[in-house]
Amino acid sequence: RLSLVGSEMCIRDRYNRKGFGVLPRAVVWGLLGMGINMAMIVFSKGVPQFMEYMGMENASSIINGEFCLDKLWVALAISVTMNTIFAPVFMTFHKITDTHILDCGGSLRSLVTPIPMTRIITHLNWDAQWNFVFKKTIPFFWYPAHTITFLLPGEVRVLFAAILGVVLGVLLAIAARKK
C-alpha cells in the first residue's frame, strides 16, 4: 500500500538502491489502489445492508448521514469487517508482489514475468506477517484509522485511506530506525 511510499520518504537510500524497482512498484501500487477502492465500496455498502438484515434499522442511511453514535458503530463495523476479511489477503498479496519485483531486480520485466506464488509464499516471513502485520497493524492502526475513514463523506474516503497508508509507512520507518 501507500505505507511503503511513506516509509520510502523516510528511508531515501533504499529506493535509490539498484533493484528496488520504483516504476514497477508504482504500477503495482496503482492496481492495489483500485483493489482498495473496490473493497471500500463493497464493504461500505455491504456491511450496513447486513446490519439491517440483522436488525439495525437504517444502517445504510446512517453511515451517509450526520455524525451520531449509530454512525460511529456502523463505521466501526465496516472497518473491522473489511480489515478482518480483506486486509490479510491484500497485505500478503502486496508482500508477494514486492518480493517478486525485488526478485526481478526491480526491472519492468517484473510486470510481465509470472509470479512464482508457491516459492514466494513458502519463503515469506510468516512470523513477522502474523505477529506484526496482522496482529498489530490491523487491530491497533487499521481498525481505528478506517473507522475514521468511514465517518467521512464517501468521495474523500479513498484519498484519506491513502494518506493513512503514508502515515503508517512513516511511523514504521521511524520505528525501524530506532531498532
Residue ranges and their predicted role:
Residues 140-149:
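Hydrophobic, membrane-inserted alpha-helices
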Residues 47-72, 105-116:
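Membrane-interface interhelical connector segments
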Residues 7-8, 165-176:
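Alpha-helical transmembrane segments and their membrane-interface exit regions
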Residues 13-23:
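Membrane-interface helix-boundary motifs at transmembrane edges
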Residues 1-6, 11:
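Single conserved hydrophobic/aromatic residue that forms the stacking wall/gate
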Residues 21-34, 63-86:
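Alpha-helical membrane-spanning segments of integral membrane proteins, especially the hydrophobic core
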Residues 33-54, 75-108:
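Transmembrane alpha-helix/helix-exit interface in multi-pass inner-membrane proteins
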Residues 105-136:
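Membrane-helix boundary/juxtamembrane motif in polytopic membrane proteins
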